[in-house]
Amino acid sequence: MATFEKGKVFNENAVIDYAEGGVVSKELIHNDSGSVTLFSFDSGQGLSEHFAPYDALIQVIDGEMELTVEDTKHVIKAGEAFIIPSGARHSVNAAQRFKMMITMIRG
């Protein structure tokens, strides 16, 4: 797994590895304004339905994910993004393994 430093170029896909049968998260930035977090999901993993207090920008960086927002399923592939509105019910399913970066800005 690669590392990263502020002020230096890094490959976000190389910063986080997959864990067999699991979900891995790595927070890149966290401050009073918001957070940027990388996640990797192995096949068959997911997150049950929940709400976020702020808009969330999801960027898939490897594989493809299934995101259900307010009962509508979306398939998002590497290189694609989706903004989840604040307060929207959503869940995540990994039909195949994938990595994503989520950016949440408080406001």
Locations of the language-model features?
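Structural motif
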Residues: S35, E64-E66, K73, R89, ...
